[in-house]
């Protein structure tokens, strides 16, 4: 039951606020509670701003807590200019000298709660959060300070994704080697789970080699948690934490262990731990982008010297898109606390250093005190009792000094104390003014009662009443603060004089002691007034007048020479007051004169500006007209140039087209002419060769062989009827049948050639080159065929003649077609000369046709090779209908004889299909 009551009382004390803090801030709700403090959301009554009020309970309980509190205040003040570090607004001390109050700017949430909610942060938000975090750490590291406690709960964030780093209780400098460190003592403790998951390996193994890489490891853990939405290494103890880290990272080398430094925990890193691929960084962050995985791997490196620095990390592709020059903030000097960071001092030294810091800030900002309770964070007013006690102690230590010296020494101490109080006080409250008035009346009564009735000076004149103050006036003039300090000094001097009078020797009379007292009091008053002279002069004339009247009313008036001097001083003050009134009366005229001068100067300046603007406008109008004309001319010129360019382009296109057509026509005409000329030459050659062949083989081409061939190769009657006109016999007496048919052949061939030339020339004009028909140039079907010769002219197959079926017969199974080239014989008694002539013509025709066919095939092969080499399509101007020829059928009945023409060799042209 007792333990429960104690715990309940402790909890109630934690929840309570100091009276001074409660009077300044309106607490709205509690935001959170930690191991060292509690945070409220509050509103400042003075500025109406929403702030975060943090109470550090038992801040000076021991040296460790005192050093933690001191570090947090010092480093927050040093880094308060950075936008990504939480700003310390104000600090307050508690009345119990144990608790401590810190006032921060208000932030809506922290990163831990944002991650815990789920998919609140998108990829761009994570990148921006990481950029701000790296930017803040870079600024901290530029001051040679490390945070050492980076975790999501220490990173504040608002709805606009603005981030601020907080909680600098574990931060420290790297300027010198430390003697004591709180992390060395509890580095291996298992109850500090919240931060263990984000600690670097060198801290887990209790290494003394602290570097800035500690914070970079924490950044990697935070980024991994944002991407994975849960911590990367959730160790249940320090050993388990090290095992999880080693499992996820690559193999540990001796160089990695040496980089951490010798420690008892380095043995854990050197152990062979079985690695599971499921817990590697690649597997845990498989859903992340490549840039994010790359940054995490670069930060989570076992060797602290190989980790990315803050300056390198801010240029990483994952966050480089947010980098801009204006955000680059660095400290160009190290942050050095007033108390050395590597030495642990007493609790009182840390407390006194912080209290002095509060006093200096109070003096600089001139803040007002909300009430005069003892729990205020401002220094209390010195009580006269304490001053008297100090004076007694001082006089007891110096018994040989004179009474004047004994009174002078405590007064100097009080003057110094009063100066300090004047700097610390921002204003005085009504309760303080009442207390001062009561004290002054008590001092006056003591000074009057100290003298005997016989030697008492005449009663002083009635003091002037104090200037009343309105209850609604909240501002207190500065001169009243100074006057209050003077009155306190007078009270201290009077109290010290009273004590001295009670202890003085019996031989000194009361009149003498009273005179000395007044003389010394006058000197001390003059000294106090001189110390506050500058502050009084800085006040407005009305406040100076009020302070002077208040001083005259409250100052004690002696009745001897001192009173005469005081009267003279009053006259001087009245004169000074009249001069101030004159100055105050003439002040408005000078002000009005100055305002008039300023107004005239302003009017002149405005007039000059208007004139300048008008001149600029006229100049622009004058310059714009020629510019418009020039622009119009240029536009017209550009249009003309465009038209000419278009016409020139069209003309060039037409010329190129006509040139191509002309070139094609010239090429086609040249091709046709060359072809005709070539055919003529070949016909002449074939004629000569045919004649030579007939002369050489006259014995072979006898009448018997010809009759045999005519019988087998006689044409049908239908074809004879179609060519009846062409096969009409010449009149008797005009040449032989062979000469008649040859002359007809030559005439018809010449006509056909002329007709084809005309057709080619006509097609050359119409560009119709697609279907050229040159079949008639090679066919010879204009000779009349012989009629069937009687069977009696054919020898028996085995008679032994030329046409017999024996091996020695040269005309066996040779079915030649001479019928198309010779006349039909009605009687077998035809003239032998005519037959010989016909046979010669037939041989000549066969030779010419064979040469033509071979040459044509040769030309076609050359033409095809040329097309294949150029890899181009066959042009229409070169296209003509190819003549298809039958292949020679192999004869399996008789051996080949070169002197024996076959039907395929002699009459192949007759079997070709008619062209369309």
UniProtKB/Swiss-Prot annotation:
Effect of residue 190 to A: Does not lead to transitional endoplasmic reticulum sites disassembly
E.C. no: 2.7.11.24
GO CC annotations, alphabetized: ciliary basal body; cytoplasm; endoplasmic reticulum membrane; nuclear envelope; nucleus
Disulfide bonds: none
Polar residues composition bias: residue spans: 364-376, 390-403
Feature: compositional bias, Basic and acidic residues: 590-608, 715-730, 800-811, 894-903
Stretches for region Disordered: 364-419, 452-477, 588-608, 711-742, 792-813, 883-916
Entry GO MF terms: ATP binding; MAP kinase activity; protein serine kinase activity; protein serine/threonine kinase activity
Classification via InterPro entries: Kinase-like_dom_sf, MAP_kinase, MAP_kinase_CS, Prot_kinase_dom, Ser/Thr_kinase_AS
SUPFAM superfamilies listed in its UniProt record: Protein kinase-like (PK-like)
Keywords: ATP-binding, Kinase, Nucleotide-binding, Serine/threonine-protein kinase, Transferase
Positions of the Protein kinase domain: 25-319
Pfam families tied to this protein: Pkinase
Catalytic activity: L-seryl-[protein] + ATP = O-phospho-L-seryl-[protein] + ADP + H(+); L-threonyl-[protein] + ATP = O-phospho-L-threonyl-[protein] + ADP + H(+)
Residue spans crossing the bilayer: none
Effect seen on changing residue 54 to R: Does not lead to transitional endoplasmic reticulum sites disassembly. Partially rescue transitional endoplasmic reticulum site disassembly induced by amino-acid starvation
Induction annotation: Amino-acid starvation stabilizes protein level. Up-regulated upon impaired ribosome biogenesis and starvation.
PANTHER family: MITOGEN-ACTIVATED PROTEIN KINASE
Protein name from the UniProt record: Extracellular signal-regulated kinase 7
């Amino acid at each position: 039951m007792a333990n429960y009551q104690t715990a309940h009382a402790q909890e109630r004390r934690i929840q309570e606020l100091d009276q001074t803090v409660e009077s300044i801030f309106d607490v709205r709700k509690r935001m959170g509670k930690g191991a060292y403090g509690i945070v409220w959301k509050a509103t400042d009554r003075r500025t109406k701003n929403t702030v975060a009020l943090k109470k550090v309970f038992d801040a000076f309980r021991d040296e460790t807590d005192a050093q933690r509190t001191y570090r947090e205040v010092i480093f927050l003040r040093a880094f308060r200019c950075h936008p990504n570090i939480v700003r310390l607004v104000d600090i307050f001390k508690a009345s119990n000298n144990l608790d401590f109050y810190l006032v921060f700017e208000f932030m809506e949430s922290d990163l831990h709660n944002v991650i815990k909610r789920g998919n609140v942060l998108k990829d761009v938000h994570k990148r921006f959060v990481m950029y701000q975090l790296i930017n803040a750490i870079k600024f901290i590291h530029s001051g040679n300070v490390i945070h050492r406690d980076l975790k999501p709960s220490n990173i504040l964030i608002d709805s606009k994704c603005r981030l601020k780093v907080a909680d600098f209780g574990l931060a420290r400098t790297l300027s010198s080697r430390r003697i004591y460190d709180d992390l060395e003592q509890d580095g291996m403790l298992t109850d500090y789970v919240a931060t263990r998951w984000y600690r670097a390996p060198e801290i887990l193994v209790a290494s003394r080699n602290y570097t800035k890489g500690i914070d970079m490891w924490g950044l990697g853990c935070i980024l991994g948690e944002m991407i994975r939405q849960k911590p990367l290494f959730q160790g249940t103890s320090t050993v388990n934490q090290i095992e999880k880290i080693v499992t996820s990272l690559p193999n540990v080398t001796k160089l990695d262990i040496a980089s951490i430094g010798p420690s008892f925990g380095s043995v854990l890193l050197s152990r062979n731990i079985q690695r599971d691929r499921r817990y590697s960084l690649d597997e845990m962050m498989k859903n992340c982008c490549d840039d994010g995985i790359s940054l995490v791997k670069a930060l989570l490196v076992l060797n602290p010297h190989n980790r990315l620095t803050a300056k390198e990390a801010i240029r990483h592709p994952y966050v480089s898109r947010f980098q801009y020059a204006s955000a680059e903030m660095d400290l160009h000097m190290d942050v050095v606390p007033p108390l050395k960071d590597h030495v642990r001092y007493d609790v009182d030294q840390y407390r006194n250093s912080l209290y002095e810091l509060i006093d200096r800030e109070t003096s600089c900002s001139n803040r007002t005190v909300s009430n005069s309770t003892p729990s205020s964070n401002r220094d209390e007013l010195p009580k006269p009792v304490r001053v008297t006690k100090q004076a007694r102690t001082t006089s007891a230590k110096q018994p040989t000094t004179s009474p004047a010296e004994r009174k002078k020494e405590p007064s100097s101490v009080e003057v110094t104390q009063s100066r300090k109080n004047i700097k610390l006080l921002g204003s005085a409250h009504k309760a303080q003014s009442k207390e001062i008035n009561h004290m002054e009346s008590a001092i006056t009564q003591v000074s009057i009662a100290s003298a005997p009735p016989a030697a008492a000076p005449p009663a002083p004149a009635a003091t002037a009443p104090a200037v009343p103050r309105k209850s609604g006036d909240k501002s207190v003039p500065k001169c009243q603060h100074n006057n209050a300090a003077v009155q306190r000094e007078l009270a201290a001097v009077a109290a010290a004089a009273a004590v001295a009078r009670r202890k003085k020797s019996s031989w000194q009379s009361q009149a003498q002691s009273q005179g000395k007292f007044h003389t010394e009091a006058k000197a001390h008053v003059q000294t106090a007034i001189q110390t506050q002279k500058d502050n009084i002069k800085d006040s407005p004339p009305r406040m100076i007048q009020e302070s002077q009247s208040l001083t005259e009313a409250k100052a004690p008036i002696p009745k001897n020479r001192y009173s005469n001097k005081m009267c003279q001083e009053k006259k001087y003050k009245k004169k000074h007051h009249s001069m101030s009134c004159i100055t105050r009366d003439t002040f408005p005229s000078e002000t009005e004169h100055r305002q008039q001068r300023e107004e005239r100067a302003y009017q002149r300046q405005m007039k000059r500006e208007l004139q300048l603007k008008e001149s600029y406008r006229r100049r622009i109008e004058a310059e714009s007209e020629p510019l418009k004309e020039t622009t119009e001319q240029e536009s017209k010129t550009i249009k003309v140039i465009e038209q000419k360019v278009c016409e020139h382009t069209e003309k060039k296109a037409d010329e190129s087209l006509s040139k191509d057509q002309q070139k094609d026509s010239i090429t086609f005409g040249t091709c046709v002419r060359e072809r005709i000329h070539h055919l003529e030459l070949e016909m002449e050659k074939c004629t000569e060769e045919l004649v030579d062949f007939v002369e050489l083989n006259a014995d072979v081409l006898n009448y018997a062989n010809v009759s045999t061939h005519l019988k087998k190769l006689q044409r049908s009657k239908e074809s004879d009827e179609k060519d009846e006109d062409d096969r009409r016999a010449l009149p008797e007496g005009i040449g032989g049948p062979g000469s008649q048919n040859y002359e007809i052949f030559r005439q018809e061939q010449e006509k056909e050639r002329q007709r084809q030339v005309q057709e080619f020339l006509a097609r050359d004009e119409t560009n119709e080159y697609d279907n050229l028909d040159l079949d008639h140039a090679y066919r010879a079907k204009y000779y009349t065929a012989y009629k069937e010769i009687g069977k009696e002219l054919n020898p028996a197959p085995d008679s032994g003649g030329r046409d017999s079926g024996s091996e020695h017969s040269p005309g066996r199974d040779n079915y030649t077609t001479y019928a198309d080239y010779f006349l039909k014989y009605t009687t077998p008694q035809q003239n032998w000369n005519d037959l010989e002539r016909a046979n010669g013509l037939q041989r000549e025709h066969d030779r010419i046709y064979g040469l033509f066919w071979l040459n044509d095939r040769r030309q076609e092969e050359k033409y095809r090779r040329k097309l294949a080499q150029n890899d181009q399509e066959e042009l229409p101007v070169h296209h003509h209908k190819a003549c298809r020829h039958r292949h020679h059928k192999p004869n399996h009945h008789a051996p080949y004889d070169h002197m024996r023409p076959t039907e395929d060799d002699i009459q192949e042209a007759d079997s070709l299909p008619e062209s369309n």
